[in-house]
Amino acid sequence: MSGTTEKGMSAHAARMTRRDLLKVGVATVAGASLGSSVSSPAEAVTVNWQRYRGTTLSLLFYKHPWVDEIIKYFPEFESLTGMKLQYEVIPEVQGREKLVIQMTAGTGDIDAWHASMHVEKRRFWKSGWFQPLNEYLRDRSLTAEDYAWNDMTKSAVEAVTQPDKTISALPTFVDPFVLFYRKDLFDQRGWGPPKTLQELEDRARALHNPPSLYGFVMRGLKNANATPWAYVLYSFGGQYLTPDRKSAMNTPAWVKAMEWYAGMLRRYAPPGVVNFNWYECSAAFMQGQVAMYIDGVNFANQFEDPAKSKIAGKVGYAVLPAGPAGHFAPTFTNAMAVSAQSRHKEAAYLFCQWATSKKNCNRELLAGVGVARASTWGLPEIKAKPRMPLSWYQAYQDSLRIGRAGLPEIVDVTQYRDIIGVAIQKAIEGAKPADVIAEAHRQFQDLLERTEK
């Protein structure tokens, strides 16, 4: 809720309630090797969690399901360490504005924050606001042996690793895009989920029966449409940047991707899709008006809520279909970062480590929040009573395996989203894909020349 601010100091022990979750087989998700940048010493050293007893940490969080869950266990951290946690939870846009103001002023008032790496990664790195964590991860007097950095999924580690190989944050949450589809309608026809873009289009055409049912939907609204666009772009072999960090838009892959994206929405989406954000797409899907929808996997909770959704229990979840250039899923990663201006850097790191530990990742997944650790998906508790459909867990894991950054790693991500977003809107409205890509290329190259020096 925009404008809402929550401040807190944890004061009493929180108890974990066992959640009923889905039965799913253990599937290995390739983690990233620590490599030479974060190596493990031969001798084990016990972490002294009480070394900063009496310290008060100031934390900033953007509103997020992961945050809602981890806050419940703050008293546990305080008991473990003897530290106190002061924290603020505010909407992401306002939170980032506050963070930028304080970082620019150099106040040092924030010790750690829950970073949106897909927006902040390069900008904050170039500004020197991330405290590099490589040495902390290497130091066994600071990092518990069972923390298991190699348990983090490859896409999550890539999201927090900078071009100079410094690690800027510890991953908390990874949101891949997946395919939502009307399983009941597919079952009636003996279909499984589409495996290729061509199959997806064929099924959209077969199911499209307006105004009662539309075959397909994705975001059409400018800026918002930049996130699903990544999937189509990668599927056709497109890249954001050339090796020398110039615009890579002026290629046939971008034009082909735009032809597919705009064409699918013109032919098979509900009227007015050019102004659809995730909310409008989700609403149409939940009302039973759309057969297939591509967006972030964590929208599933509302689809399965009978109080909100007419299609609860009728939704299938699948990894995105492969395209001509390969199989990809855009991912968006959040992570706990230590401020380079903090006066309590090591203490703040202990909090970030605790928050992203196996124990807390397990708690998050049991609460229905996707996590960056591979091992968590094999929890025995997940094999108990299902909280979500089997296909949700499988789609999530399959998507983590093929995850790829959903936005370009540049300083001004927001401006890029506006540039490509307007181009997509114009193409949906009927402009020639080659023309809108040519104009977007000029604008994007100008942006890079101004901001990437």
Please report, for each region that a protein language model flagged, where it lies by residue.
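Extracytoplasmic/periplasmic solute-binding protein
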Residues: V157-T172, F177, E199-S247, V290
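Hinge/lid segment of periplasmic solute-binding proteins
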Residues: V45-R51, M117-P176, P228, A312-A318, ...
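Glycine-centered hinge/linker elements that transmit conformational signals in sensory
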Residues: A204-P210, D244-V274, L320
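Extracytoplasmic "Venus flytrap"/periplasmic binding protein-like
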Residues: E76-M152, D184, Q188-K195, A291-M292, ...
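Long, aromatic- and glycine/proline-rich binding clefts that accommodate carbohydrate-like moieties
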Residues: V45-T46, R53-T56, N150, V315-A318, ...
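N-terminal secretory signal peptides
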Residues: M1-D20, V24-L34
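Extracytoplasmic/periplasmic substrate-binding proteins
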Residues: Y73, E120-R122, T227-Y231, S235, ...
